[in-house]
A protein has these predicted regions:
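Conserved acidic segment of CheY-like receiver
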Residues: 5-18, 22-26
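Short, flexible helix-to-coil linker/hinge segments that flank and couple to helix-turn-helix
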Residues: 93-100, 104-153
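Active-site residues of response regulator receiver
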Residues: 59, 87
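Short amphipathic alpha-helix used as the core "switch/output" element in two-component signaling
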Residues: 46, 68-80
Length: 154
């Protein structure tokens, strides 16, 4: 890939209207190219193997196969592909499952276009982006777990 080549992106969401909106959003950035869309985790895996995109925008809650399961398989089969979890949910277990499955970033669907574009660029460069809400959930959970342990420190 040369400096002028756009970042190749696949959208994965079971809601056609959301994919349409993201398609429109991506068209506004010269450095981002939509190369495929999937409505399910299984379809996403097939597309990633076939097209080997740079970045996948992955919904986490879908019927049939959820985004975390699809992310794990995509990362195993195409390890150069970075996955951004893009969801409406900010529950601790979902955030942890997405990151443990191999997602490099976790964003909420209310993210601004500029923030999402920058997160795609950062993911392509190997850097993480977490929604502030996700960061807050993880910090609270970690602090709660730390408070449950007596480390014998004085």
């Amino acid at each position: 890939m040369t400096e002028a080549d756009p970042i190749r992106v696949i959208l994965v969401d079971d809601h056609a209207m959301l994919r349409k909106g993201l398609r429109f959003f991506l068209a506004g950035f010269d450095d981002l190219e939509l190369v495929g869309e999937a409505a399910s985790g299984k379809e996403a895996i097939r597309l990633c193997v076939e097209l080997v995109p740079d970045v996948v925008l992955m919904d986490m809650v879908m019927p049939d196969m959820d985004g975390a399961a699809a992310t794990q398989i995509i990362r195993q089969q195409t390890p150069t592909v970075e996955v951004i979890a893009l969801t409406s949910f900010q529950e601790e277990d979902l955030i942890e499952r997405a990151l443990q499955a191999g997602a490099i970033s976790y964003l909420l669907k209310n993210v601004s276009a500029e923030t999402l574009a920058e997160a795609i660029r950062q993911a392509h460069a190997g850097h993480s982006t977490l929604a502030p809400e996700a960061t807050e959930v993880l910090v609270k959970a970690t602090r709660q777990r730390a408070g449950q342990h007596d480390y014998g420190l004085t």
